[in-house]
């Protein structure tokens, strides 16, 4: 309890000092508490008249659950299980899903296929992924004489086992064999400038080589991921993983649940197989998937399938500029948004342009974000590009992306630097071998066949984004240090939107349309200077 003076007693201050960063300021942070305890604490905080420090004393240190701490445990490793058992009831009593956002966990996922990595990274809100880079790390290593790629148990017990293994090994062998050849080719093509440090040149050259060759890696290639996510994120992701058609993904879901139950059990317990929420979610997702799949097959059978690669603007908001201008003025006006829209539709065009220019004219670099009003205009694109580029762009969050199955039916992207060189033929040979293997396997196992498809093969996806998100993406992904595949996509999206209406060029002023050689050289040189 609080002392009679309304503050904390010396003993209370001593106890609290282990768990808060200060005892007097109205702004402070929590420390040395398990995620489940912090989450439960905040869940009660929103419905209490007490301050958080007083609530921590009353409910967690002096109250019913006070014995969850052993006297000799006053650092990060506390009695997590004791706290979880007691405060699971607290969380369940409040019942709000948002309570699941008050605690989180870091999870390492190693030896995951690049195909599964994309399924993991489909989860958008509440989680932050980081993946092993294909431009800084070589993927030519072997362990016990085997290249590091996922061997799907269904394929490994099927008639396609040898085809799958032979094709993946061939792809990795080609990747490994071409590394020194491409490096030597680029050293001649882009000799080191005497004013550039050797280390900066080496890093840039390596990125160029690996960017060029990553398309040979099959989707089965093993990678490592690190995730931080809040409890609600993990619960939703686990439901999706456990219902996936791929064995690997379901196994990842089961193993992730096991580990997260050790850290944030109260936040992910609904994903346990025996929980009544779990089966209802699984049944819902399966029924929905089957229904939508049947519609797609029924209504798409008679129409010819486009195989054209590139970026195509499918939809642009015809009232987008009016919406942006009205939203720009809204916070500083007393009119309704509807009234401001009407005003913007009826003012002279030069006045409308002045309003739009005001949201862009003060920007000095791409990190100067435009006002949120820019989010009121939306665009939808059809994109058909290599899976490697998709892997990069899929990480963007504030938008809608939906992809189709990875196949070899849409062709592949040939690295421009290898065309008309001795390296072109082995690259194309590897692509053709992968195509043959995919088509053979896909007749019986269309989803598992994705594992044998190299990153150079094209995938089609829907890309729906607002103008502010497009601004950020195009200006970031068009920078010279980026991979040529996603640079082209970013530049093409910007051009498509500007062609839709030239006024949008105002908001895309830092898109870099230049052609580059060693794209990362300037950035690496800045690091060394």
UniProtKB/Swiss-Prot annotation:
SUPFAM superfamilies in the record: Thymidylate synthase-complementing protein Thy1 (SSF69796)
Position of the signal peptide: none
One GO term of the biological process aspect: dTMP biosynthetic process
Assigned keywords, A-Z: Repeat
Domain ThyX positions: 38-274, 309-511
GO molecular function: flavin adenine dinucleotide binding; NADPH binding; thymidylate synthase (FAD) activity; thymidylate synthase activity
Pfam family, one: Thy1
Sequence similarity: Belongs to the UPF0159 family.
PANTHER family named in the record: FLAVIN-DEPENDENT THYMIDYLATE SYNTHASE
Stated name of the protein: UPF0159 protein CT_632
């Amino acid at each position: 309890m609080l002392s009679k003076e309304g503050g904390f007693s010396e003993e209370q201050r001593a106890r609290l000092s282990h768990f808060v960063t200060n005892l007097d300021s109205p702004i402070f942070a929590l420390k040395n508490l398990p995620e489940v305890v912090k989450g439960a604490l905040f869940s009660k905080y929103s419905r209490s008249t007490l301050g958080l420090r007083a609530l921590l004393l009353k409910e967690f240190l002096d109250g019913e659950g006070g014995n969850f701490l052993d006297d000799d445990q006053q650092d990060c490793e506390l009695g997590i299980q004791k706290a979880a058992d007691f405060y699971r009831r607290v969380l369940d009593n409040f019942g709000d899903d948002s309570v699941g956002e008050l605690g989180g966990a870091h999870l390492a996922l190693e030896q995951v296929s690049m195909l599964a990595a994309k399924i993991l990274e489909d989860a958008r809100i509440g989680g932050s992924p980081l993946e092993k880079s294909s431009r800084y790390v070589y993927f030519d290593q072997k362990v016990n004489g085997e290249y590091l790629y996922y061997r799907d148990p269904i394929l490994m017990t099927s008639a396609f086992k040898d085809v799958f293994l032979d094709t993946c090994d061939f792809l990795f062998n080609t990747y490994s064999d071409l590394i020194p050849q491409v490096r030597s080719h680029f050293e001649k093509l882009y000799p080191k400038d005497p004013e550039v440090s050797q280390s900066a040149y080496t890093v840039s050259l390596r990125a160029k080589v690996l960017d060029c060759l990553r398309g040979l890696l099959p989707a089965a290639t093993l990678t490592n991921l690190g995730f931080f996510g809040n409890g609600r994120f993990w619960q939703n992701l686990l439901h999706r993983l456990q219902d996936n058609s791929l064995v690997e993904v379901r196994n990842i879901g089961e193993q992730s649940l096991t580990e997260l139950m050790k850290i944030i059990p109260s936040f992910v317990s609904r994903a346990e197989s025996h929980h009544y929420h779990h089966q209802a979610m699984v049944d819902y997702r399966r029924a929905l998937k089957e229904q939508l799949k049947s519609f797609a097959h029924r209504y798409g059978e008679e129409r010819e399938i486009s195989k054209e690669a590139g970026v195509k603007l499918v939809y642009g908001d015809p009232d987008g500029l009016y919406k942006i201008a009205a939203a720009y003025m809204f916070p500083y006006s007393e009119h309704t948004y509807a009234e401001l829209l009407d005003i913007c539709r009826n003012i002279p065009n030069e006045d409308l342009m002045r309003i739009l220019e005001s949201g862009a004219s003060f920007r000095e670099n791409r990190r100067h974000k435009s006002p949120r009003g820019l989010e009121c205009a939306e665009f939808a694109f059809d994109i058909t590009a290599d899976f490697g580029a998709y892997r990069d762009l899929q990480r963007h969050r504030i938008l809608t992306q939906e992809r189709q199955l990875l196949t070899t039916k849409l062709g592949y992207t040939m690295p421009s630097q290898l065309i008309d060189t001795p390296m072109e033929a082995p690259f194309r040979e590897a692509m053709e071998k992968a195509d043959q293997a995919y088509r053979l396997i896909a007749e019986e196992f269309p989803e598992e066949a994705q594992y044998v498809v190299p990153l150079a093969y094209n995938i089609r996806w829907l890309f729906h984004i607002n103008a502010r998100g497009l601004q950020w993406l195009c200006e970031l992904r068009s920078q010279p240090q980026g991979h040529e595949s996603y640079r082209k996509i970013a530049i093409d999206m910007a051009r498509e939107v500007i062609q839709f209406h030239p006024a949008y060029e105002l908001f895309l002023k830092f898109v870099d349309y230049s052609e580059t050689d060693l794209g990362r050289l300037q950035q690496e040189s800045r690091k060394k200077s």
